Amino acid sequence: MAKEQGTKPIAQNKKARHDYAIEDKYEAGLVLTGTEVKSLREGRASLAESFITIDRRGEMWLEGANIPEYLNGTWNNHAPKRKRKLLLHAAQIDKLARQTQAKGFTIIPLSLYFKDGRVKVEIALARGKKEFDKRQSLREEQDKREALRAMRYANKQVR
């Protein structure tokens, strides 16, 4: 079988971009079992309530991510919401650990995808938005949409 090329998205954390202001992004590998990979190949995953922690030994963990059991799995199927280890360089983990000590910063998963046949997680160093920030960003997006709509309408009238 030929080796897979390119990226294939599995799951997005859409709420994260709404609730957090993203400062910096990283790509991390993920330690998985065989049935987890098979379940991900079927496109079954959710990052909705997931978060990332750094333990005392300097290891990063993805917690709360839901990868449902593989339907054709046997007795050795995985637990759907277990902790999963993230693979990053030690220097990157140290940098993220220092930055999360700063006020208001946290590490969140943004997306889960296959890259050249391996499962990767896009994680971000983020700061939580206040309620008025969320409303303002929604208003800005709506204004952009209305401006594009008006420009399309004006261009259509010219023809």
Swiss-Prot record:
InterPro entries per record: SmpB, SsrA-bd_prot, SsrA-bd_prot_CS
GO molecular-function terms, A-Z: RNA binding
Pfam family, one: SmpB
Superkingdom field: Bacteria
GO biological process, one term: trans-translation
Major site of localization recorded for this protein: cytoplasm
PROSITE patterns, per database record: SSRP
GO CC aspect terms: cytosol
Localization annotation: Cytoplasm
Alphabetic keyword roster: Cytoplasm, RNA-binding
CDD domains for this protein: SmpB
Function description: Required for rescue of stalled ribosomes mediated by trans-translation. Binds to transfer-messenger RNA (tmRNA), required for stable association of tmRNA with ribosomes. tmRNA and SmpB together mimic tRNA shape, replacing the anticodon stem-loop with SmpB. tmRNA is encoded by the ssrA gene; the 2 termini fold to resemble tRNA(Ala) and it encodes a 'tag peptide', a short internal open reading frame. During trans-translation Ala-aminoacylated tmRNA acts like a tRNA, entering the A-site of stalled ribosomes, displacing the stalled mRNA.
Family: Belongs to the SmpB family.
HAMAP family the record matches: SmpB (MF_00023)
Entry protein name: SsrA-binding protein
Gene label: smpB
